[in-house]
Amino acid sequence: MKKIFCLAIVLAVFVNVNTFSATRKSNSNKKNSSSQINSEAAQVALKFITEYSSMTDNTEYMRNTKLITEKLRSEYFQIFADAYLNDDIVDADSIIAGQDAPSKYKVISYNSKTGLVVVQGIDWKKQIKLKVKKINGKWLVDGSGVLNMD
């Protein structure tokens, strides 16, 4: 009887230690993801998409913003050039990969290894993926929506 009682106590202690350890790991992962969402890279992406969506003249914004790479700027304007050459119109926004985007967003996730930032509009279900890249010590948006996301 003593052996069974001792075994039950040892088992209970072992289960509690494992549960405590798993909880600690889970909490540290939450802290890491929260710090990644608030990282400079993710905040640059958030600032870009918020500014872009609130502008009435997006082409002027894309021409002048310092938050994007030249590659993204070039791809953005290439879409309009191609449409003009083909006597076509651009009816969807390639930066948000759709139409009618909100003007306020929040960062959902950021992967520091891939540079992928996912944002979502406040009271909006659709998510937008952006790619950030550090160039000359400065974080810039290098891809968004359907542009340069390969």
Q: Where are the regions a protein language model picked out?
A:
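Surface-exposed, charged secondary-structure patches
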Residues: 73-124
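Second-shell loop/turn segments in exported
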Residues: 30-38, 58-62, 118-119
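Short, aromatic-enriched amphipathic alpha-helices that serve as compact interaction elements
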Residues: 36-57
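Boundary at the C-terminal end of the N-terminal hydrophobic targeting segment
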Residues: 19-22
